[in-house]
Amino acid sequence: MPTFDTTKQIFLCGLPSVGKTSFGQHLSQFLSLPFFDTDHLLSDRFHGDSPKTIYQRYGEEGFCREEFLALTSVPVIPSIVALGGCTPIIEPSYAHILGRNSALLVLLELPIATLCQRLQHRSIPERLAHAPSLEDTLSQRLDKLRSLTSNAFSLRAETSSEAVMRDCQSFCLRFLSTKESSYA
């Protein structure tokens, strides 16, 4: 039976609709660690306003500042943290993540076509709403995220509980495995 290192603060980044929040919640339960979502923390700071509303009100620069403040409000403890789609791309936020002891930044991935399909059924983030080509913009952003971390993990497009649990196990085996435990 493998054992997992639960002393890390795991930051999940990825494109919009990849499943950072959903997977992060399942992973936190799987590992019995607290879960934080910077989008939810940001909304809480603005009495429930959505990130889209906050972006419209403050523009790109103001929104980035607020994303950074939401990130800095996350306690430095072993936990799972779902980052807003652009949070790690913002230099102060990226430096803040890397400056934390035992931080692990992991890029969650799904095929761009799957993400475009998901975004068609949801609200497209304000940063992407006026992009000439959603697919090209997502591809460029994915390249930028890939340049920030060599830790990438491909999720399954399937969202059943069983599939998510398999993803949690695979994730832990890949990034958090310590050694085999013997119960003899």
From Swiss-Prot:
The record's family statement is: Belongs to the shikimate kinase family.
Q: How is the cofactor bound?
A: Binds 1 Mg(2+) ion per subunit.
Under HAMAP family, the record lists: Shikimate_kinase (MF_00109)
* Reported cofactor(s): Mg(2+)
The reaction(s) annotated as catalysed by this protein in its Swiss-Prot or TrEMBL entry are:
shikimate + ATP = 3-phosphoshikimate + ADP + H(+)
The entry marks the following residues as binding ATP, namely S17, V18, G19, K20, T21, S22
- Please give the biological process terms from Gene Ontology that the record holds: amino acid biosynthetic process; aromatic amino acid family biosynthetic process; chorismate biosynthetic process
Q: What does this protein do?
A: Catalyzes the specific phosphorylation of the 3-hydroxyl group of shikimic acid using ATP as a cosubstrate.
Q: Which organism's genome codes for this protein?
A: Chlamydia trachomatis serovar D (strain ATCC VR-885 / DSM 19411 / UW-3/Cx)
**What's the protein name?**
Shikimate kinase
Subunit note: Monomer.
- Top-level division of the source organism's lineage: Bacteria
Identify the metabolic or biological route this protein is part of: Metabolic intermediate biosynthesis; chorismate biosynthesis; chorismate from D-erythrose 4-phosphate and phosphoenolpyruvate: step 5/7
Q: Which gene encodes it?
A: aroK
Q: Name one Pfam family in it.
A: SKI
Localization recorded for this chain is:
Cytoplasm
Task: Look up the EC number in the record and give it.
Answer: 2.7.1.71
Name the positions where substrate binds. D39, G85
* Keywords (A to Z) from UniProt: Amino-acid biosynthesis, Aromatic amino acid biosynthesis, ATP-binding, Cytoplasm, Kinase, Magnesium, Metal-binding, Nucleotide-binding, Transferase
Q: Which NCBIfam families match?
A: PRK00625.1
Alphabetized GO MF terms: ATP binding; magnesium ion binding; shikimate kinase activity
GO CC terms, sorted = cytosol
**Binding residues for Mg(2+):** T21
